[in-house]
Amino acid sequence: TWPEASEFCRAQGKRLPREAEWEKAARGDSGHLFPWGQQTPTPELAKFGQYLVHEIPIVAPVERGEADSSPYRLHHMAGNAAEWVEDWFGIDYYATMPDRNPRGPNSGRYKVVRGGSWKSEPVMLRTATRSGASPDRRAATIGFRCARSLH
């Protein structure tokens, strides 16, 4: 759940990244369509589109490769597990937020989830694609990464 992810990060002296931080970390300054560049996702670049019908999904480590890294050398920013971020979901986020240090709404019904998961279609792996989920949702498709401020 979002509260569990947030608490885990806080216990480590960190926090969930803000949505704008997550996107910049994924796309870099050059505006990549996907974390690794403009190339359409392939199984070598991301774990995605894996629908299981009569099997139970098993969580397992995913090997880190150089091909899937973002411009800031972060791995698995697309596919594998989608990721909770700090912000509440605002449908008009891109239209209403300032260009510098944007923040999501102060409250809402859903928290933002970024990056797509092992179950996602390729379009969900784009660096600008965003979705929302109820903060109390627990799913095998949603994980998180912690961030820390540099100053």
Q: What are these model-derived regions, one by one?
A:
Residues T1-S131:
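Functional-site microenvironments in short loops/helix caps that host divalent-cation chemistry
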